[in-house]
């Protein structure tokens, strides 16, 4: 029996759970079996690219973080979910840190394990030849 608060739109996506039957969550893009969680069912998180089991976390379900390049298990952190860090090469567990999530450092040449130090994340040092312990 379909829950009355969900309706036909939500029931088609397998959204018959009690914790998912709310007006802000009853949308086809959000109400799915992998996204029917109270922490994920918010209007800002009801997007196809964000409603996945790896991304349904309170820290990742925000308008600025609901993107495929950021919403991953290794990058769903408050310090990484900023507009300046929204790049595929920056959303990795090795350099998802506040010191590296900045426009001048969000590049493949700088954001590496050997070059994500505060003193190294500057435009003059973000170069392949400089990404070493002796230089940075």
Swiss-Prot record:
Q: Where is the segment annotated 20 X 5 AA repeats OF C-C-[GRQVS]-[SPT]-[VSTQ]?
A: 5-129
The UniProt family comment states: Belongs to the KRTAP type 4 family.
Q: What is this protein called?
A: Keratin-associated protein 4-2
Q: Which Pfam families match?
A: Keratin_B2_2 (PF13885)
List, in alphabetical order, the Gene Ontology terms for molecular function in this entry: identical protein binding
Keywords, ordered alphabetically: Keratin, Repeat
The uppermost taxa in this organism's lineage are:
Eukaryota, Metazoa, Chordata, Craniata, Vertebrata
Q: What would be one Gene Ontology cellular-component term for the protein? A: cytosol
All disulfide bonds of the chain are: none
Q: Where are the sequence repeats?
A: 5-9, 20-24, 25-29, 30-34, 35-39, 40-44, 45-49, 50-54, 55-59, 60-64, 65-69, 70-74, 75-79, 80-84, 90-94, 95-99, 100-104, 110-114, 120-124, 125-129
Assembly description: Interacts with hair keratins.
PANTHER family on file: KERATIN ASSOCIATED PROTEIN, KERATIN-ASSOCIATED PROTEIN 4-6
Where along the sequence do coiled-coil regions lie? none
Q: What role does it play?
A: In the hair cortex, hair keratin intermediate filaments are embedded in an interfilamentous matrix, consisting of hair keratin-associated proteins (KRTAP), which are essential for the formation of a rigid and resistant hair shaft through their extensive disulfide bond cross-linking with abundant cysteine residues of hair keratins. The matrix proteins include the high-sulfur and high-glycine-tyrosine keratins.
């Amino acid at each position: 029996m379909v829950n009355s608060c969900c309706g036909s739109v939500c029931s088609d996506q397998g959204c018959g759970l009690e914790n998912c039957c709310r007006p802000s969550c009853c949308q086809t893009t959000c109400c799915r079996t992998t996204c029917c969680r109270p922490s994920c069912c918010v209007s800002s998180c009801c997007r196809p690219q964000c409603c996945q089991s790896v991304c349904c976390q309170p820290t990742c379900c925000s308008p600025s973080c609901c993107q495929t390049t950021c919403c991953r298990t290794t990058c769903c952190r408050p310090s990484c979910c900023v507009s300046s860090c929204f790049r595929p090469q920056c959303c990795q567990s090795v350099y998802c840190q506040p010191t590296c999530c900045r426009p001048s450092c969000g590049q493949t040449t700088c954001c590496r394990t050997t070059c994500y130090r505060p003193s190294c994340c500057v435009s003059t040092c973000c170069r392949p030849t400089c990404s070493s312990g002796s230089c940075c």
